[in-house]
Swiss-Prot record:
Keyword tags: Disulfide bond, Repeat, Secreted, Signal
Compositionally biased residues, Gly residues: 207-310
SUPFAM superfamilies: C-type lectin-like
Protein name as it appears in the record: 34 kDa spicule matrix protein
InterPro entries per record: C-type_lectin-like (IPR001304), C-type_lectin-like/link_sf (IPR016186), CTDL_fold (IPR016187), SM50_spicule_matrix (IPR052890)
Family statement: Belongs to the SM50 family.
Major localization listed first in the record, in broad terms: secreted
GO cellular component annotations of the record: extracellular region
Gene3D superfamilies named among the record's database cross-references: Mannose-Binding Protein A, subunit A
Tissue specificity of this protein: Embryo spicule.
Ranges where the record places region Disordered: 199-335
Compositionally biased region (Low complexity): 311-323
UniProt subcellular location: Secreted
Protein's organism: Lytechinus pictus
Amino acid sequence: MKGLLLILASLVAIATGQDCPAYYVRSSSGASCYRYFNIRVLHRMASEFCEMVTPCGNGPSRMGALASISSPIENHEVYRMVASFSQDNQMENEAWLGWNTQSPRFWEDGTPAYPNGFAGFHQSGSYTSWPSWRPGMPTSGWPVNPANPWTPPPGRAPVMKGQHVTPQQPGQRPNLGPEWDLVEATAMRAFVCEVAAGQNIPPGQQPGFGGQQPGFGGRQPGFGGQQPGFGQQPGFGGRQPGFGGRQPGFGGQQPGFGGQQPGFGGQQPGFGGQQPGFGGQQPGFGGQQPGFGGQQPGFGGGPQRPGMGGQPNSPNPRFNRPRMLQEAETDVTGS
């Protein structure tokens, strides 16, 4: 049973954005919200359940409690709410109220029990019913027990129950309303929870200012609808960090200057769009392979292999002779 109460409490404690939790009824005074639970439990379990209910909106931070009755209007409102759950609009089950003989001077929500409480009891202190107040009757007729708290047997708690008074004259409507009684706290009864009402929050306005997320003006935290910072992404002017909508650095380029890769101009690191070095060539000078003059490393204008003016040095003297003699010998040999 206690597990069931915990589940119910988790459901009713969800705020709805209104002034009362879900399925609670606001009192005519606007100060409280009530809900009747037609679950028969011990007084202690009913009290613990109500204490898990939280108020909605910006209501007081105190938790809920079993209902405390402090006026004839409130007494009748709670009764009508409970009676509305029956087919004949009369209470079918007695319901626990938020007081017990363990702390007789106060209701369980901390409000004084005297002089505004116990109005449903007869002033004689016999704990029997007292004819209830009805709408239109003067509130001054609400009996108040001016004495110190009674000293009934310990372990008792009040219940609200239906009352039917037979008309005194033919044609007079019966007096239907609540009366209270003291019963053993170990008895099983239904109960009524009360929680302070919060201020009604207009739809779509979350806590903060002007319907926006916490911050100013409907924007994300910061200023002016932007991401944190000023007007844009962090930094200045709607851009990425840095200046002017560009990547970090200056002028929309990659880090460095201009639109180029790091360095100067549009080239790779170095100068003039070429590979590292000068003039668009491979490392070296003049577009040639390393060395001078477009040739293989070495000197001369030919595409020969490394060496000086001929084939690479070879142990065969034939290959070290001038090309003209080599070609002549080739012609003679071939012929």
